[in-house]
Amino acid sequence: MSIRLSRRAALFSSAVAASSAALPGLALAQVRADTRTDEEIAAAADAWVQRCMAAWPEQPAVSLALVRDGKTVLAKGYGVRRQGKAEPADEHTLFAIASNSKNVTAACLAILVDEGKVKWDEPIRTYLPGFTLSDPMVGERITVRDTLSHRAGFGLGAGDLLFWPNSDRTRAEVLAQAAFVPIEDGFREDYHYCNLMFVVAGAVIEKMSGLSWEDFVQTRIFDKVGMSESVPLARLADPKKSALPHGRVGPPLRYQGAMTQIADSIVEVWNWDSAAAAGGICTSAHDWAKWIAVRLNDGRLADGTRLFSEAAAREMVKPNIIVSSSNGPTAELPNRAVASTYAMGLQVQDYRGERLATHGGGSPGGISATVLIPGRKIGFSVFTNAEESFLLRALRSGLSDIAMNQVDVDWIADSKKREAEGTEKSLKAAVEIDAKQAAGAAPSMPLDAYVGTWRDPWYGDIVIEQKTEGRGRNRKTGLWLRFTHTPALQGWLEPYDGETFRTRFPDKREEDAFITFNIATAKPATATVKGVSPDIDFSYDYQDLRLTRV
């Protein structure tokens, strides 16, 4: 049995990264001349991917794009599109790249800045009159730059339940509900990853261009760059050309157990139409290599024309908020940055004394990474169709070292060690969770006291009802919970310990939750929610729900 952490790990592990912006207070080494040929670098990268695939034999597919000096030196697929099928992945296979889409959204705004239609530091209200947030001051002052920099003051993943898992809410409804999502921290004080503000950025693109986000991406990015295989929305991705999602769905918890295919198409588990600007794109190694070349060339296209200006390119990699800081690498953390920051749609940091910029991406059944090293005019991407975050760590770190010609860490051994430690910790937690339920106190009230409609200001309604299912010995009666805007989040609500209950969603791709009811009078009046698993994906932001009986 094994565990692979959620996309939290893909986005927030000690990432190697890239940027042409200076990092404040950090002296960076001069890049040493690299006399290796493109073929030598490509061969080393190819061999490394094959080693990693051998070390993680359950991984179905990996896709690699490697670019140097504006030229694709390697675009290749490894493995199969779906587990157990003779359907090879190649450089044209589509993968969901999730949050790697964010730097495309930033580039869309860069184009509008160049055209004089948008300013980076202009308040959102200039473009979206009436826009507001739960903190009126933040709603008044927040700018385009803020929406792209994870510094608005929201908690990690705040508001993601508006569109994750697949929701029935429209883009306009998500934008309207953003006004009620709680803001926990100071404005522009701390970094907290926030998909919701990229939805706002996407709305600015739509309002100021007159095009939908997806049409703008298609006509102003994909068509200009020559990315003919890419699609801006997962529902447009042909399943026959896609790497299908895989993951571990237990038992005992999500991200544990055996590897399995979890969907027959990407859109089945990743329909982010309402939040596409935060992570909607599906692309191939063949196409994304072209995008990497544009970013490394500061917006210049292969024909010499510009997609966006050099000034805009510099602005997009200018650090806006500190993610973390440290004393640098150690034997235990060999790739730890001295300073890690977030710019606009890209994370910017140091690595091995050089300036770097990166982003991760994670969707159900797939994680990915893009790494740019502009001082060397080299960059790469790694796409996968499973949630093996330690595999991605080994791939990303090892390929970065190959690109920088400094191979001195065994990233497979390092990642395997961390994987084993994480597995042991998570399985222990799962045993403790089940043991506590077995020994838990009974609820203080009969089950019908908890029945009703429970409302959160930003999510909406959660309905609890009594339900009977099956016949004879298979007959089951109990509480059934239903998130009204999220079809997959419905299932049995079982007593756990006292006034705390836990869900048992039949769809094992989803994360279960604890609900604790607060007894005010004769019936529960309010309730709070949190995830069951210690490895829960941050986008299940149950903890932000504040339920009141309607």
Predicted feature residues:
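Boundary at the C-terminal end of the N-terminal hydrophobic targeting segment
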Residues: 27-29, 33
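Active-site SXXK
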Residues: 46-49, 64, 70, 95-124, ...
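Short, conserved catalytic-motif segment at the N-terminal edge
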Residues: 36-97, 117-119, 127, 133-134, ...
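Peripheral terminal and inter-domain segments
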Residues: 33, 323-324, 332, 397-550
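Short, surface-exposed loop or secondary-structure junction motifs
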Residues: 82, 136-364, 369
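N-terminal secretory signal peptides and thylakoid transit peptides that target proteins
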Residues: 1-17
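Short, well-ordered beta-strand elements
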Residues: 358-359, 369-372, 376-385, 527-529
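Contiguous hydrophobic, core-forming segments of folded domains
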Residues: 374-404, 408
